[in-house]
Amino acid sequence: MTELNRVVAHFTDGKLLKGTTQDFFPNRPRFHLQPAAGGAPVEVRCRSLKALFFVKEFVGNASRRDLRGFLNSPGETAQGKKIAVRFKDGELLCGYSLSYLPDREGFFMFPSDSGSNNLRIYVIAAATVEVKAGPSADVLAQKVLATRPE
């Protein structure tokens, strides 16, 4: 039996779609998403995505503030090496990845904030402007966060 995953699809045009999927595989160009609001399944083309967030719940805690950057996180964990991702829309994600390779179409990462509603995130490389792994991930995160108010 295939696992049912709760996901939030973030599209490059800014649209969000919440639902479940059983057929997402990183090596396939499309998958089906059953909208949380009901209705017929939607075919999602990966090239139209910014990222696919695998979440604990569809309704997050609105009063919770996500931790910014890496704080005092170790350089490497069981979830991989530090990675900082800056998207074309300016969003910064910090976390860990076991599977990042610069020439791939995408990669999985785990959030650096263990209290996050996100379990893991599949990042579409074409939606990024900068990805840094290892010690340079800290440098990128600090650079981007220094230009933003808390």
Map each language-model feature to its residues.
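Conserved RNA-binding domains used in RNP assembly and mRNA/RNA metabolism
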Residues: 1-150
